[in-house]
């Protein structure tokens, strides 16, 4: 299985993803949190998600969010929405981050729509910044601040616990 076709730097085999996950379980890399997305009914892995935490000062203040559902027949079934909600809870409720950044190809309409649905706001574009499939692509940068998350989630506020499987507590 080839995961994350749209992320050339993150295209990864299941075996490589599992190796990264084992590294995270051992606590070898606090800054990168990788998660395996499992289909609930079959418990089969269908993708990955990540939080790449910014540690530019002593206090972690933000992270890049990433996810990919590897198989087309699993797209548009609500997995992305569910995973992003869990990542938002992890980032803001557990890690107490101030902001999240979402990077995506400009032509990835599904990713842009999901980001905006989850409250992210477009902040910029890096023109022809990624070379993939023999051509350059623009990247769109979206951001979500803690107060925007709080305003969005407050009517739905749940106890601050995460259902994501991760290596460190």
Where are these regions (language model features)?
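Conserved GNAT-fold acetyl-CoA-binding loop/helix
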Residues: 1-23
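Acyl-donor (CoA/ACP) binding surface of acyl/acetyltransferases
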Residues: 34-169
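A short hydrophobic/aromatic micro-motif that marks alpha-helical segments and, especially, helix-coil
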Residues: 12-13, 28, 153
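Non-catalytic substrate-recognition and accessory regions of acyl/acetyltransferase enzymes
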Residues: 1, 30, 39-41
